[in-house]
């Protein structure tokens, strides 16, 4: 997102030239200003949820079920969005299932691919060799595969768990997409199955926003003749109760942002309180992480305005002053800043003080220092891009990416996200791990940076913008824009492969932490899939309404 425009003072006193972005305004008005939680409805949902949870827990741990049936139950729980209630029981079951798995079982493609996806999602490195029996002597898929729509759909979803060196999964990905696309809307698919296929082709399970995907799956599962009514009821109640919590939290955040009144002082910036909360809810949606969602949202909002200050308003001289002030992190530095920057700087210091006080009450404020240092690092990199723009410099792609992996916010978002987790999960060692520049955090940052570079390129260049990764690659390699886009998407796919590999056991840190990095990567896939949905929030408006406003009919 970040780069810069500049404009030097003309004749000493004239207003400097500013390359204003004219970002779209907030969509929401006062829509989320007030919300009263219906405590009676909340309690009603909660009481029934507790009863159903115990029934489902008994189902998960019950013996006598075949392995294929058990893996399918786990899959349904995950896709319905209720597996977080049974994490311990599911992990115990998967450990046993993986240890006993035999690929010589007479499993069909759907079942094999389902095992592969679920095991990989939980860190178990199942080999691609399990798919060999579906290929002929020439290595091509057998004709029977093309006739198995459910099997192809299951394989398609499994291919998103690929790591580097797994060429078969690349082939399977291309094959299943081609086959499924040819079947959509045709006479061989029921309308319900066709709808599932179309949604899967638009948004894979592995890269989707977990809560949104759960809501989609609930609507599909409701039409499944083999559905389990207990699971369906639990999923609906759980979604609706959690939606009430999220809506109440969003109301608090929205009011806080309005009272802060920062946008009135920096009207050039994007006003995106709702979208930042949406982003934070992807990082962690579970009810116990309400503090984390608030912390992450507030820091993201400050970063967004800071980004726009460097990207679409501040002059180079002003930006140098602001960079120095952030490095000092002291209220006395405010005296050197222009008035509009004083408002932003004051908000930055105050919000971090507020966050530190809130986390100190729970004994987990030790991560705040790491978040501050990450913020300082990003601002330094923003200034580098401002200088590049001022000089008209087009960096080599390697030089660009070295700086872009900082401005991609991977370290800051990961650090700030970890601050909202339990102290026994987000330990001091976890924050020290981030400082080692781990491959997974770098990969997550690369995904966000490169997909944003592609999706926002034309608009940013039109108003005046530092050379993006797309520009740097085109110049260095002498290729067209379309050729460069193809290469950047190859890099994005490799970054996803790295994320998948880093989540295979044994992992460097707890899976409870790694899943947050994965979730931060997922939001890039959702928000920037077709256009920059953060800058143009109408693109994700339906997602926001679905997640925070529209309950599931009971």
From Swiss-Prot:
Binding site residues for Mg(2+) 2: 307, 311
Might you give the EC number(s) for this enzyme?
4.2.3.204
Q: Where does Mg(2+) 1 bind?
A: 307, 311
- Supply one GO BP term: diterpenoid biosynthetic process
Q: Which SUPFAM superfamilies match?
A: Terpenoid cyclases/Protein prenyltransferases, Terpenoid synthases
Signal sequence residues: none
Q: What residues bind Mg(2+) 3, as annotated?
A: 452, 456, 460
For this chain, the annotated S-S bridges are none
What cofactor requirement does the entry state?
A: Mg(2+)
**Keyword terms, alphabetized:** Lyase, Magnesium, Metal-binding
**Cofactor binding notes:** Binds 3 Mg(2+) ions per subunit.
The pathway to which it is assigned is:
Secondary metabolite biosynthesis; terpenoid biosynthesis
Listed Gene3D superfamilies: Farnesyl Diphosphate Synthase, Terpene synthase, N-terminal domain
Citing just one GO molecular function, the answer is: terpene synthase activity
Domain-level remarks: The Asp-Asp-Xaa-Xaa-Asp/Glu (DDXXD/E) motif is important for the catalytic activity, presumably through binding to Mg(2+).
This one is known as Valerianol synthase TPS8
Q: Which organism is it from?
A: Camellia sinensis
């Amino acid at each position: 997102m970040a780069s810069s425009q500049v404009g030097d003072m003309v004749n000493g006193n004239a207003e400097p030239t500013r390359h204003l972005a004219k970002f779209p305004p907030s969509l929401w008005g006062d829509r989320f200003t007030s919300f009263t939680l219906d405590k009676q409805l909340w309690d009603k949902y909660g009481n029934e949820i507790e009863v159903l949870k115990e029934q489902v827990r008994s189902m998960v741990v019950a013996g006598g079920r075949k392995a294929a049936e058990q893996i399918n139950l786990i899959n349904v729980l995950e896709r319905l969005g209720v597996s977080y209630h049974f994490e311990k029981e599911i992990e115990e079951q998967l450990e046993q299932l993986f240890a006993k798995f035999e690929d010589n079982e007479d499993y069909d493609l759907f079942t094999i691919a389902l095992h592969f996806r679920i095991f990989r999602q939980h860190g178990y490195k199942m080999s691609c060799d399990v798919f060999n029996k579906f290929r002929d002597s020439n290595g091509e898929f057998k004709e029977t595969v093309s006739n198995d729509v459910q099997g192809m759909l299951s394989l398609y979803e499994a291919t998103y768990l690929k790591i580097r060196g797994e060429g078969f999964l690349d082939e399977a990905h291309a094959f299943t997409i081609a086959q499924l696309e040819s079947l959509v809307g045709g006479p061989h698919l029921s309308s319900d199955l066709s709808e599932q296929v179309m949604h899967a082709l638009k948004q894979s399970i592995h890269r989707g926003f977990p809560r949104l995907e759960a809501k989609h799956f609930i609507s599909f599962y409701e039409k499944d003749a083999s559905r389990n009514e207990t699971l369906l009821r639990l999923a609906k109640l759980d979604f609706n109760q959690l939606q009430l919590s999220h809506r109440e939290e969003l109301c608090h955040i929205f009011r806080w942002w309005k009272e802060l009144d920062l946008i009135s002082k920096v009207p050039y910036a994007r006003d995106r309180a709702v979208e930042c909360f949406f982003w934070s809810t992807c990082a962690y949606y579970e009810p116990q992480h309400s503090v984390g969602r608030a912390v992450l949202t507030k820091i993201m909002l400050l970063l967004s305005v800071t980004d726009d200050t460097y990207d679409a308003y501040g002059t180079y001289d002003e930006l140098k002053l602001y960079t120095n002030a952030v490095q000092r992190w002291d209220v006395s530095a405010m005296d050197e800043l222009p008035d509009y920057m004083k408002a932003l700087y004051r908000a930055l210091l105050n919000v971090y003080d507020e966050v530190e006080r809130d986390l100190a009450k729970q004994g987990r404020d030790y991560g705040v220092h790491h978040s501050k240092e990450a913020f300082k690092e990003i601002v330094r990199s923003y200034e580098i891009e401002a200088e590049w723009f001022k000089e008209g410099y087009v960096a080599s792609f390697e030089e660009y990416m070295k700086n872009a992996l900082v401005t991609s916010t991977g370290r800051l978002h990961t650090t700030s996200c970890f601050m909202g987790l339990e102290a026994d999960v987000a330990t001091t060692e976890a924050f020290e791990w981030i400082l080692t520049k781990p491959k997974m955090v770098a990969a997550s940052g690369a995904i966000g940076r490169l997909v944003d570079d592609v999706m926002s390129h034309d608009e940013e260049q039109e108003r005046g913008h530092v050379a993006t990764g797309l520009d740097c690659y085109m110049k260095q390699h002498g290729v067209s824009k379309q050729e460069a886009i193809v290469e950047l998407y190859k890099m994005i796919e490799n970054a996803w492969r790295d994320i998948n590999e880093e989540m295979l056991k044994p992992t460097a840190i707890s899976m409870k932490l790694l899943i947050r990095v994965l979730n931060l990567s997922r939001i890039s896939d959702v928000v920037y899939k077709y256009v920059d949905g953060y800058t143009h929030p109408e693109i994700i408006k339906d997602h926001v309404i679905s997640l925070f406003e529209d309950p599931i009919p009971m």
